[in-house]
């Protein structure tokens, strides 16, 4: 990992933490196949570094998980509805679209998401 790539990831993490009033943890001990997660009860995003080969993958995973944070800010009761398959599928579809956008144009996707997080999560506690 180059210093520049690492700096880009750290910058994006900081932007998501500030705009989304959340915490981002970079983990090295996730189970195989888990790229990242959003834990609404802990208001934190986990990025599984051990399951990514580069920072580019971590960045788009961060966008995906930050979209789940945004979804939670838009509808705080979502955490209670996560047992409904249709709700989970809709949430994952929206997050996957954000991830795909990030793969195509990381800067534009990150800027849009940062603005949305500021607007929708601004009054949320950390």
Write out the residue ranges for each language-model feature.
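Glycine-rich short-loop/terminal segments
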Residues: 1-40
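Sequence contexts marking disulfide-bonded cysteines in secreted/extracellular proteins
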Residues: 29-31, 47-49, 96, 120-124
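Short pre-active-site segment immediately N-terminal to the catalytic Zn-binding motif
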Residues: 45-62
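Solvent-exposed loop/turn segments at secondary-structure junctions
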Residues: 51-53, 68, 76
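Post-HEXXH active-site segment of zinc metalloproteases
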Residues: 56-60, 72-105
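Short active-site segment of divalent metal-dependent hydrolases/proteases
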Residues: 63-71
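Long, well-structured alpha-helical subdomains associated
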Residues: 101-126
